[in-house]
């Protein structure tokens, strides 16, 4: 019998722009957990490190709830990167003008599932 259970993790208000994290998320969607972590930690981007932490958290949640689960049975199913809070501040410019500076953050949602064959 084919068993499929899903486990999730969320990272909220992470200090990176969603525009920069989404292309990284596309690289790991649908891959095995070990391969996804290897891809993320070999990338030089800050967003890859943040995404790696959330993926590891989702896998840890899966292994906590199912003690018989190994890392080889975990696959990344869903990765969503949404807009987080925006911190706005003023950037002084020449001649008494000012520009608005927007520091963006993102919310990352990761869903992993276990793939195993067994009789339950």
Curated annotation (Swiss-Prot):
Descriptive protein name: Large ribosomal subunit protein uL22
Q: Quick one: where's region Disordered?
A: 1-20
- Source organism, top-level taxon: Bacteria
- State how it assembles: Part of the 50S ribosomal subunit.
Q: CDD domains under this entry?
A: Ribosomal_L22
**One cellular component GO annotation, for this chain's record?**
cytosolic large ribosomal subunit
- What Pfam families would the database entry show? Ribosomal_L22 (PF00237)
Q: Which GO terms describe its biological process?
A: translation
* Alphabetically ordered keywords of this record: Ribonucleoprotein, Ribosomal protein, RNA-binding, rRNA-binding
Protein family: Belongs to the universal ribosomal protein uL22 family.
Known role: This protein binds specifically to 23S rRNA; its binding is stimulated by other ribosomal proteins, e.g. L4, L17, and L20. It is important during the early stages of 50S assembly. It makes multiple contacts with different domains of the 23S rRNA in the assembled 50S subunit and ribosome.
The gene name reads: rplV
**Which InterPro entries does the UniProt record give?**
Ribosomal_uL22, Ribosomal_uL22_bac/chlpt-type, Ribosomal_uL22_bac/org-type, Ribosomal_uL22_CS, Ribosomal_uL22_sf
Locate the coiled-coil region(s) and give their ranges. Answer: none
Molecular function (Gene Ontology), one example = structural constituent of ribosome
Q: Which SUPFAM superfamilies match?
A: Ribosomal protein L22
């Amino acid at each position: 019998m084919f068993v499929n259970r899903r486990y999730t993790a969320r990272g909220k208000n992470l200090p990176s722009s969603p525009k920069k994290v989404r292309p990284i998320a596309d690289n790991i969607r649908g891959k095995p957990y070990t391969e996804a972590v290897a891809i993320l930690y070999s990338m030089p981007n800050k967003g890859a490190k943040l995404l790696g932490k959330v993926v590891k958290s989702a896998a840890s949640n899966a292994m906590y709830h199912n003690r018989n689960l190994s890392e080889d049975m975990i696959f990344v199913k869903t990765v969503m990167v949404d807009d987080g809070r925006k911190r706005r501040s003023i950037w002084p410019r020449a001649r008494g003008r000012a520009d608005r500076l927007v520091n963006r953050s993102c919310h990352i949602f990761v869903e992993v599932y276990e793939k195993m064959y067994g009789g339950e």
